[in-house]
Amino acid sequence: MDNKRLYNGNLSNIPEVIDPGITIPIYEEDIRNDTRMNTNARSVRVSDKRGRSSSTSPQKIGSYRTRAGRFSDTLTNLLPSISAKLHHSKKSTPVVVVPPTSSTPDSLNSTTYAPRVSSDSFTVATPLSLQSTTTRTRTRNNTVSSQITASSSLTTDVGNATSANIWSANAESNTSSSPLFDYPLATSYFEPLTRFKSTDNYTLPQTAQLNSFLEKNGNPNIWSSAGNSNTDHLNTPIVNRQRSQSQSTTNRVYTDAPYYQQPAQNYQVQVPPRVPKSTSISPVILDDVDPASINWITANQKVPLVNQISALLPTNTISISNVFPLQPTQQHQQNAVNLTSTSLATLCSQYGKVLSARTLRGLNMALVEFSTVESAICALEALQGKELSKVGAPSTVSFARVLPMYEQPLNVNGFNNTPKQPLLQEQLNHGVLNYQLQQSLQQPELQQQPTSFNQPNLTYCNPTQNLSHLQLSSNENEPYPFPLPPPSLSDSKKDILHTISSFKLEYDHLELNHLLQNALKNKGVSDTNYFGPLPEHNSKVPKRKDTFDAPKLRELRKQFDSNSLSTIEMEQLAIVMLDQLPELSSDYLGNTVIQKLFENSSNIIRDIMLRKCNKYLTSMGVHKNGTWVCQKIIKMANTPRQINLVTSGVSDYCTPLFNDQFGNYVIQGILKFGFPWNSFIFESVLSHFWTIVQNRYGSRAVRACLEADSIITQCQLLTITSLIIVLSPYLATDTNGTLLITWLLDTCTLPNKNLILCDKLVNKNLVKLCCHKLGSLTVLKILNLRGGEEEALSKNKIIHAIFDGPISSDSILFQILDEGNYGPTFIYKVLTSRILDNSVRDEAITKIRQLILNSNINLQSRQLLEEVGLSSAGISPKQSSKNHRKQHPQGFHSPGRARGVSVSSVRSSNSRHNSVIQMNNAGPTPALNFNPAPMSEINSYFNNQQVVYSGNQNQNQNGNSNGLDELNSQFDSFRIANGTNLSLPIVNLPNVSNNNNNYNNSGYSSQMNPLSRSVSHNNNNNTNNYNNNDNDNNNNNNNNNNNNNNNNNNNNNSNNSNNNNNNDTSLYRYRSYGY
């Protein structure tokens, strides 16, 4: 734009002609020198015509849709009246040369570039610029026809307006108060308040509502001819019309044409009554805002998960990290001035109009909202990687979005009476959930917070919880049983050396000392979100002819694919692209071209290219396109010079690369360089071990390094393996860290690894691991190891540590059972698996039963109780051995259904599921007492039950006999010679009822197996009693047997009418096998 004149970096004096069919840019010519200013109008016009004919066609703005031909011909043919007025205005318009102002922009503003909007320019200011006193903005609806016709009706003596200065009247600025500081360079910061003159502005507003709105906000003189007018009238000055206005067909297209074609009138605007949401047009500037008070999302990965989003299109809002407060915040006193957000708004105002600027509490982040998306894009490109708030802490700028908050209607009486809503609805409305730990569960609970009247959004009163630790997996929600963070390298150095010596392998002591010393002195970046410097973007430098844009890159890629370029041409191309090499490496087309150049260039050219981009290898390696170039560079590096250049550019950022999705492949590629080039990788792992292994990608990258046993040295393998064993309790309880424990147990080939690991787990950590859901899986994995002597020894060491020892509250078994989270479940898994031998299992069940009956353990695991033969209800604490052992409560849903043996018991004892004997009685409820039997005498799944009926009844001590031996003998008699067991009938309990007569009426109704006959058995040993056998089925056979020890005794005591019955029925379960 050599021949185009700019007015103080503004295109306000460049009129436009917008026609439905064509769009034509109109420019005004530059004044070549100062002598031409004094020539007459005719000479100026002749010289301008010559200049236009000799110059090339002007560069067109990107927003115009069509090309314009010859400007003069097109303008004359389409709009003759406008062309005449334009030439008339050039004849009578003197050019005013204004020297540059003394105010200069600061260094930061001089290096940044404004967005490409219709009111801004990219041309750098010159020492002598043509400055106009017009308003710096104009609306797009101000067409050329409307502007010229409006200017032709004005005289030069009304105010200070001339025909050349048609946008404003004078240079008097608005002096309305602003809550912020003075921003001389913020040309679009307070546009509605500062760009309109108070008295002599002849440009009509676009809508009448804006005039009324501004007058109601403390500026009554906008667009008003009278300074003391406080009404909502649109007052225009009285002007002299020298000639009639020319009509144009283009005026009919626009809605504002009647305002410019008709005489201005004084009329009152009828505005519907409404209450504006905000009475201030200035941007919202807030410091130390609670992140939960606004509903916002961003693509930055440093924010809490509730505010993260994987992909976000460009928006008008950006999030800036590493924004620290400029002044200390007092706990009991609010800051009088928002210094941080105000300075941030000042900085961002040069890229466009700022609507709001907020700094978030506890996150060191800020949200800046612009009026347009283009302003946000420009600010993101300019501020990316800059040290905005603190030296050494570059800021990461990402797109963000502030979503509307759901606000419930306020309650006059208070906020506690708000109606309850479902949890999912509250989550959608507010987006904040607090997790409260209750034993083993983390139940989500919504924080009900009142609405704040200080901010327009919904705020929260007591935000005390940082949501950055919020995880999605159930294992991650479980807290760590050990104090965090784990011991550092300096604290665990002795343990590492002791573990290395336990392997009893030979290694290089000098290499080990060198590795540990460098790891202790490691000064690499520990921030996993900082990836080093970024290459300069193309938009920040002046555009040159040799810039490689997308069409050129696409053409080069076609030439590479067709092998049409020679080696010399490729090397020449590499030298030409040298300045843009880091930037093109991250381009979706440029990265393929750079890879081809590294593949086909000589070592000298590769060295030159590496020296240019080695400091950007980290930022390239974490980019989805640049990582391919970075891996290609590592693959093609084959000389010591090239290897040194690659390692020097990556060594300081090893930890961020480990934890990145694409950067971890860069580390694995450098690993092949071997010792000593890859030593910095293991030094970084030792120095930042817990930071790396907690990450999803970091733990897998460490495992990949350990599996490359052909590349790494014996010392490096021993050091990392020893550190894994030392921190194994922490790794076993972490979702990503447990991958290294699995590698150690399954893949590692070091001797005695299992025994060394068991010593570390058993020593003071076994109880916490067994009671942790994820940690117990590691213990079970060790117990299920199959192999040689080492695996057996490690398994026995854990089993003896758990089940050996005294039966007391200090034992490991008691502590595991007493833990209400996951400890009983772990014991149940150990008992039901094939880990234990039969003898060890029986001893373990006996010990568990004794602990449960003789201690205060409130065991809630029904499966474990059934596995050891106890009931899941009715176990009272501190039961002595004199009390009888209880069995399952016989409460059934239907009379014909009975509860049977548990599934685990059936599976472990190879028995068939039978129904338990049913009890139906019309008399008092029977009380169940159980006599415990030793494990050696009776199977734990068969229970000797004793039914005693309550009432005015006395137990007959003489009639009781030991039925256990008889039951055992009967079980033995039910075997056939070949060892096959028979299915026995299931006998129901008798229905015992007492009547007014002094005799016992016992009705026996039995239900036989479907394959056997129905038989009722009445057993009586006392011949002095009256026995009445009433059966519902008269066809049943009644057999009187004296085999069982069931005695019905009628004893006469002092109460003549009392009937004392002692029914000592020995109940048992029968072993039942399939037919």
Swiss-Prot record:
Name of the protein in its database record: mRNA-binding protein PUF2
Misc. comment: Present with 377 molecules/cell in log phase SD medium.
Domain called PUM-HD: residue spans: 511-872
Swiss-Prot/TrEMBL keywords: Cytoplasm, Phosphoprotein, Repeat, RNA-binding
One Pfam family cited in the UniProt record for this chain: RRM_1
One GO-annotated biological process of the protein: nuclear-transcribed mRNA catabolic process, deadenylation-dependent decay
Region spans: Disordered: 38-68, 93-112, 874-931, 997-1075
Lineage: Eukaryota, Fungi, Dikarya, Ascomycota, Saccharomycotina
UniProt feature coiled coil, ranges: none
Bias type Low complexity, positions: 93-105, 901-916, 997-1009, 1018-1063
Origin species: Saccharomyces cerevisiae (strain ATCC 204508 / S288c) (Baker's yeast)
